[in-house]
């Protein structure tokens, strides 16, 4: 890997900015193609245009976009200039386009901080170029079967990416045995986050993505579950178990359509010198559902591991707003519409659990696509638990009105 010279840099940046400008004039988004154009003149232009930036990378199956949004919102609200790939273009070309288009003509970055959402498969290409300070892994599930195959392939893709960033601090979900396994045999500093409390009821079928110990193959047992294969896992044979968390949700007094109220414990010395050994506080999260509680914990973990004050992100979580399709709410005529994006069984089940918990009546519409960005293989839909919505009840015996369209 060799850095481009000054002429290559100028031509590369010009190609990137020019292509994006042309695409936008013609009414197109211009998210990935400008990056491809930039790399024609300088294959590793991203290493130049990101040089000197402090970067958080967020990867994982579910929650990348929302966790990134929480981090970017906190940085901006605190007065820090921050770059983020809000468009969701999270492959190498998309990341190259976002960072390079926001550089000067000579390739100097215009902002000091960046929050980059990165596809699991692209992590090994992106991180050697941008040298992130922090890498967050949200969770790992079966996803886009035609692209990734089974979940262990995804685990290995992320592992290869982490191995190319030995200086990065890892913020890992302690409740996910697959994510936790990424800490094995790497030199990186690791900070753990998770939920120290169970959530709802658990069905055996929900843990199909990680039933067996990644070390010895014995079926995991659980002290408690949160959802899918996440929770207080341990192996009764070899002793492999959930790690102690430095950022943990210890109680969830309220989950509603307007968001959640949680108690969060932070072991602050994990993030630098601080007179407090630990701190527990009440945190309001402006997005609903259990998985957004996980996203908030991940964001707090990353923000503080980044070296920034915890209060900045704790305050900002109350008014964070959803990204496109992620619990996005809007009006169509007199109707309130909420859009929930799902792309795999685990995400779908959590969305359905949220819908089933709503007290008001509603119409439910399922829309399915099989385009390249979301995967051509849609067989995953047969593994989701739609019955929990149909069977939902209010109180002890009164069924809600629901219309599935």
Residue ranges: model-predicted function:
Residues 323, 341-405:
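Active-site beta-alpha connecting loops in nucleotide-dependent enzymes
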Residues 3-194, 200-212:
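Phosphate-binding loop of NTP-binding sites
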Residues 117, 138, 171, 295, ...:
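Residue-level signal for inorganic ion chemistry
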Residues 129-139, 230-244, 287-318:
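A conserved, hydrophobic alpha-helical segment in the catalytic core
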Residues 280-292, 330:
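Extended interfacial segments that mediate partner engagement and assembly in macromolecular machines
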Residues 118-143, 182-280:
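Extended acidic/charged loop-beta regions that coordinate divalent cations
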Residues 71, 75, 95-99, 296-306, ...:
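Buried hydrophobic packing segments
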């Amino acid at each position: 890997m060799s850095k481009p010279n000054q002429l290559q840099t100028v031509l590369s940046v010009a190609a990137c900015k020019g292509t994006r400008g042309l695409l936008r004039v013609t009414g197109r988004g211009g998210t990935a193609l400008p990056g491809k154009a930039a790399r024609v003149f300088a294959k590793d232009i991203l290493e130049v245009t990101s040089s000197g930036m402090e970067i958080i990378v967020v990867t994982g199956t579910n929650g990348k976009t929302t966790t990134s949004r929480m981090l970017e919102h906190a940085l901006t609200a605190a007065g820090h200039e921050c770059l983020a790939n809000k468009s969701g273009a999270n492959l190498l070309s998309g990341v190259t386009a976002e960072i390079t288009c926001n550089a000067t003509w000579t390739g100097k970055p215009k902002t000091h901080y960046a929050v980059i959402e990165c596809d699991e498969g692209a992590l090994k290409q992106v991180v050697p170029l941008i040298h992130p300070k922090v890498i967050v892994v949200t969770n790992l599930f079966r996803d886009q079967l035609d692209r990734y195959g089974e979940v262990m392939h995804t685990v290995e893709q992320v592992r290869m990416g982490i191995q190319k960033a030995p200086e990065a601090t890892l913020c890992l979900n302690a409740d996910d045995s697959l994510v936790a396994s990424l800490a094995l045999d790497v030199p990186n500093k690791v900070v753990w986050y998770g939920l120290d409390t169970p959530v709802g009821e658990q069905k055996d079928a929900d843990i199909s993505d990680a039933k067996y110990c990644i070390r010895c193959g014995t079926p995991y047992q659980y002290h408690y579950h949160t959802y899918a294969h996440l929770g207080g896992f341990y192996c009764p044979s070899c002793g492999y178990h959930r790690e102690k968390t430095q950022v943990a949700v210890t109680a969830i007094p309220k989950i509603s359509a307007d968001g959640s109220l949680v108690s969060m414990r932070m072991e602050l010395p994990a993030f630098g010198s601080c007179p407090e050994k630990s701190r527990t506080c009440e945190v309001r999260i402006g997005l609903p559902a259990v998985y957004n509680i996980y996203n908030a914990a991940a964001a707090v973990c990353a923000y503080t591991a980044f070296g920034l004050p915890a209060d900045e992100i704790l305050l900002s979580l109350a008014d964070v707003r959803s990204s496109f399709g992620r619990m996005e709410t809007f009006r169509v005529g007199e109707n309130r519409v909420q859009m929930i994006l799902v792309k795999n069984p685990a995400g779908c089940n959590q969305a359905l659990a949220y819908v089933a918990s709503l007290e008001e009546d509603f119409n439910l519409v399922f829309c399915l696509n099989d385009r390249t960005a979301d995967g051509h293989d849609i067989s995953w839909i047969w593994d989701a638990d739609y019955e929990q919505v149909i069977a939902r009840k209010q109180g002890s015996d009164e069924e809600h009105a629901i219309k599935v369209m």
